[in-house]
């Protein structure tokens, strides 16, 4: 059994060009009676259907991609996006988030790719048979980072996530250095998103 997501877009040609940067190839293209395109990258299939006048801001399109090598897939996507746009796009359409542990996904690592039509392609790590969510207590700063990741990377609210992290960093004067570094790095990324 398998499933292939069908995602809305304004232009199948725009999606084909974008997908080419990510290493996808077009396996099917139809203009009439309805615009439709099928893409494949190493067995990962995404299909798009065109809707004239479709706006990325109005998209509720989303799908989940589960992979056993999240870092390799992120690195390949990031390299293609940097080559196409001169930098890693972290705001607007398209954009990508960096891989992070996600408390809303059983603490598995994941990232989100938002295509030019506003569809969220949520990439998550495959869970190993022995892996389970951690029930270990976390520091207040670690909890703030986890919450900020959900708010910014899953819900798209970078401004609220930045407020959470800035407040947590201001209150945390005794935290572990690696947690402070991670929080400061993520806050800088959020501020970059907001500045774009």
Which sequence ranges carry the predicted segments?
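Vicinal oxygen chelate
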Residues: 2-10, 56-82, 85-196
């Amino acid at each position: 059994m398998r499933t292939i997501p069908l995602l809305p877009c304004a232009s199948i040609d725009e999606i084909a060009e974008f997908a080419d940067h990510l290493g996808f190839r077009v396996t099917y293209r139809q203009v009439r009676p309805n615009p439709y395109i099928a893409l494949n990258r190493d067995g990962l299939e995404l299909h798009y259907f065109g809707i004239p006048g479709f706006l990325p801001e109005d998209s509720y399109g989303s799908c989940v991609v589960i992979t056993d090598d999240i870092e390799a897939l992120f690195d390949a996507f990031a390299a293609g996006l940097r080559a196409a746009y001169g930098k890693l796009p972290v705001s607007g359409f398209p954009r990508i988030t960096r891989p992070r542990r996600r408390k809303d996904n059983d603490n598995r690592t994941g990232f989100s790719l938002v295509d030019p039509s506003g569809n969220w392609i949520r990439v998550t790590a495959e869970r190993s048979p022995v892996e389970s969510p951690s029930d270990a207590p976390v520091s207040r700063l670690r909890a703030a980072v986890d919450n900020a990741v959900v708010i910014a990377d899953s819900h798209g609210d970078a401004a609220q996530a930045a407020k959470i992290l800035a407040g947590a960093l201001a209150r945390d004067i005794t935290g572990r250095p690696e947690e402070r570094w991670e929080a400061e790095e993520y806050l800088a990324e959020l501020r970059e998103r907001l500045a774009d």
